[in-house]
Amino acid sequence: MRRPMVAGNWKMHGTRASVAELINGLRHLALPSGVDVAVFPPCLYINQVIDGLKGKSISVGAQNSAVESMQGALTGEIAPSQLVDAGCSLVLVGHSERRQIMGERDGMLNRKFAAAQACGLIPVLCVGETLEQREAGKTLEVVGRQLGSIIEELGVGAFANAVIAYEPVWAIGTGLTATPQQAQDVHKAIREQLAAENSEVARGVRLLYGGSVKAANAVELFGMPDIDGGLIGGASLNADEFGAICRAAGN
């Protein structure tokens, strides 16, 4: 049985004051015991969040990390080893905003994924298609290629200690949401692609859905057989809304 997971991606939001307020809200949440909960704050506030959430069952991750696992001469980057030293346990890899805006390609993301795992971080690989690609009927082709790049270079076994998040680009921050069945269809295809290589890995890996998830639609989304939780954007900036989504995953 896969343990549900809800992860909050705070993106480039927050000040020390607003982060402190959000931490306080999270500390007062009654979270379901059967759900893994994580937050991904901006790197400047990672230490503040880790310190503020001590004693609370909420893991802290980073939104990005370097292609090299150890510290060195790579200006502006943060090594996975440094994230571990700071207290992080997870890192996002390949979020659509990194792919679309920062131009990160599969080869670079393979290196980031491997570097993170080499340091003991759990990578959360983000995959998803644009609206143009969906309308052209290329959703499974695009997602399959993004997933297949990791499998080809690192082997399917790399997903034994990783999480996959399907985030249709057209549903991120737009208010649009894939229907539960649309999301399930892609999640099922992802699991089948993994199963073609290793059925045990496929059964065990957690697949999260991201794309305008809210408390109002979380129950129906999380009720799908291959959706194991969510990667939450804007709704994770409101502690009460985030808590409601976590409880939906627990149900």
Curated annotation (Swiss-Prot):
Pathway note: Carbohydrate biosynthesis; gluconeogenesis; Carbohydrate degradation; glycolysis; D-glyceraldehyde 3-phosphate from glycerone phosphate: step 1/1
Cell compartment(s), UniProt: Cytoplasm
InterPro entries cross-referenced by the UniProt entry: Aldolase_TIM (IPR013785), TIM_sf (IPR035990), TrioseP_Isoase_bac/euk (IPR022896), Triosephosphate_isomerase (IPR000652), Triosephosphate_isomerase_AS (IPR020861)
Class of the enzyme per the UniProt entry, highest EC level: isomerase
GO cellular component entries: cytosol
GO annotation, biological process: gluconeogenesis; glyceraldehyde-3-phosphate biosynthetic process; glycerol catabolic process; glycolytic process
EC number(s) on file: 5.3.1.1
Keyword Transferase on entry: no
Major site of localization recorded for this protein: cytoplasm
Keywords: Cytoplasm, Gluconeogenesis, Glycolysis, Isomerase
Catalytic residues identified in the record: 95, 167
CDD domains linked to this entry: TIM (cd00311)
UniProt cross-references to Pfam families, sorted A to Z: TIM
GO-annotated molecular function: triose-phosphate isomerase activity
Catalytic activity: D-glyceraldehyde 3-phosphate = dihydroxyacetone phosphate
Binding site for substrate: 9-11, 173, 212, 233-234
HAMAP family associated with the record: TIM_B (MF_00147_B)
Subunit field text: Homodimer.
Annotated family: Belongs to the triosephosphate isomerase family.
Annotated function: Involved in the gluconeogenesis. Catalyzes stereospecifically the conversion of dihydroxyacetone phosphate (DHAP) to D-glyceraldehyde-3-phosphate (G3P).
Protein name: Triosephosphate isomerase
Gene: tpiA
